[in-house]
Amino acid sequence: MNLIFATHNSHKTDEIRKIVGDLCTVLNLHDIGCAEEIPETSDSLQGNALQKAQYVNDKYGLDCFADDTGLEIDALEGKPGVYSARYAGEHCSFQDNINKVLSEMEGIENRRAAFTTVIALLYDGEKYFFEGRIDGEITKKQSGTEGFGYDPIFKPNGYNQTFAALGEDEKNRISHRAIAMQKLLTFLKEKKIL
């Protein structure tokens, strides 16, 4: 079975493919010939995920899923949140976002943070949502080379390393995206879709 993942992000696609394993084939927007950038204009993770999935469903007539992820930092009143991917500006890099967070967190003792992923699934005319969350903290400096996004500065609770230093196998076992994806896979198995 093919699962259509409404994303152009190759890092996310690779991560999801590793989480899913051989249960099914995950195809992204590039794989289905969609080159358009899908706007994310909602003020919620759920809204952005649904917006992306709905776009693909409307334009291509395909059942699909999409996700949106936010890093919420207590000391920054929940920022960057829904704007995590473009926190340092519309066309910023992962490093630009990291630099902005580290700059804003300079001298702050409360470093509590959480990653949340919401997956929206459009299947057979119905909408379903799956959420994953992991609590942790923002480190004072970058550590590790694996992963992407804020992984070099996010240390999950119960671990002494950042996501980027844990290695992809461990991250893909415990991450917010893995938690949400496991919920989606469980749903698909229960519905006998997988």
Give the ranges of each region predicted by the language model.
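Anionic-ligand binding patches
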Residues: 2-4, 11-194
